[in-house]
C-alpha cells in the first residue's frame, strides 16, 4: 500500500492502542493470586457475584463471542481464526458468557485464552481501516443494561429497523465495547481485591462502562469483606 493510501485510510488500530497492552493489565492483576482469592464471591455487592476467576474467564470470551460469534461473516469470509470446536469452548453453553470451566480452570489457562482472544482482536485492528469499520454494522438484542452501556459511546451506535431501538453498532463501537468490558471487569477485580485487603496493581484509564452515570461504581472499604 502506498504512503498516501496509508495516510488516507489509517488502520483501525490507531484508534485502539490499548489492545497492545490490555491483556497484560489483566495478567498483572490476577496471576499471583491464590485459589481462595480467585474464587471468592459474595452476595453483598452485585459485582461480587462473579469471582475473579469468572471475571477473567468472561474477558477471554468477550472478544471471541463478538468478533467471531457476531462479525464472522463480515470479517472472516475466507477462514475463521479458530475452529468451530475451539469457538465452542470460548462461548460455552453451560457457562454464562465465559469459557468452558472444564477446559479452562487454572488461571494460567484462562490468561492464555485472554492472550488468544486479544491476538485475534489485534489481527482485525491491523487488517481493517477506520473507513471500512465505520461502514460495517451488527445488531444486538435490546436490554436495560445496554441502554445504560450505550451512554458511554460517543458514536457508532445506530437504530435497529427491526426493533426501533438503538442497538446496532459499527465495528469501531464494537471494539470500544470490548475494551470497555475489559476495563470494567478489571475494575471489578480491583474492587474484589480491595474488599479482601489486597492492593490493586494497575492504573486503569478513565474509561469503561463503570463510568456510566447510574452504574454501581462504588469502591469497597479496604478489607471490608474479611
PLM regions: where:
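Helix-loop segments that flank and shape redox-cofactor active sites
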Residues: 24-53, 69-83, 95-100, 124-170
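Extended cationic-aromatic binding surfaces that line active-site or macromolecule-binding grooves
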Residues: 50-64
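Short, helix-capping/interhelical loops that line the mouth of catalytic, cofactor-
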Residues: 1-17, 62-134, 194-226
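A hydrophobic membrane-anchoring alpha-helix module
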Residues: 175-197
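Generic structural signal for well-ordered, non-transmembrane alpha-helical segments
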Residues: 17-20, 24, 57-60, 112-115, ...
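Short, solvent-exposed loop/helix junctions and linker helices
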Residues: 46-49, 104, 111, 179
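Acidic, Ser/Thr-rich low-complexity intrinsically disordered segments
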Residues: 158-163, 177, 221-226
Amino acid at each position: 500500500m502506498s504512503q498516501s493510501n496509508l495516510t488516507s485510510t489509517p488502520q483501525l488500530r490507531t484508534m485502539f492502542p490499548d489492545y497492545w497492552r490490555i491483556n497484560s493489565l489483566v495478567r498483572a492483576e490476577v496471576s499471583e493470586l491464590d485459589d481462595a482469592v480467585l474464587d471468592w464471591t459474595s452476595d453483598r455487592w452485585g459485582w461480587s457475584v462473579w469471582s475473579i476467576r469468572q471475571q477473567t474467564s468472561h474477558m477471554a470470551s468477550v472478544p471471541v463471542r463478538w468478533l467471531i460469534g457476531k462479525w464472522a461473516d463480515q470479517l472472516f469470509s475466507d477462514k475463521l481464526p479458530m475452529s468451530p470446536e475451539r469457538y465452542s469452548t470460548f462461548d460455552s453453553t453451560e457457562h454464562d458468557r465465559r469459557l468452558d470451566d472444564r477446559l479452562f480452570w487454572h488461571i494460567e489457562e484462562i490468561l492464555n485464552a485472554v492472550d488468544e482472544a486479544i491476538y485475534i482482536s489485534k489481527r482485525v485492528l491491523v487488517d481493517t481501516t477506520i473507513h471500512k469499520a465505520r461502514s460495517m454494522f451488527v445488531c444486538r438484542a435490546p436490554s436495560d443494561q445496554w441502554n445504560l452501556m450505550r451512554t458511554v459511546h460517543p458514536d457508532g451506535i445506530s437504530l435497529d429497523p427491526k426493533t426501533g431501538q438503538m442497538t446496532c453498532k459499527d465495528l469501531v463501537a464494537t471494539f470500544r465495547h470490548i475494551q470497555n468490558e475489559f476495563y470494567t471487569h478489571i475494575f471489578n477485580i480491583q474492587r474484589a481485591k480491595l474488599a479482601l485487603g489486597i492492593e490493586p496493581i494497575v492504573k486503569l484509564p478513565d474509561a469503561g462502562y463503570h463510568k456510566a452515570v447510574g452504574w454501581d461504581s462504588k469502591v469497597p472499604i479496604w478489607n471490608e469483606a474479611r
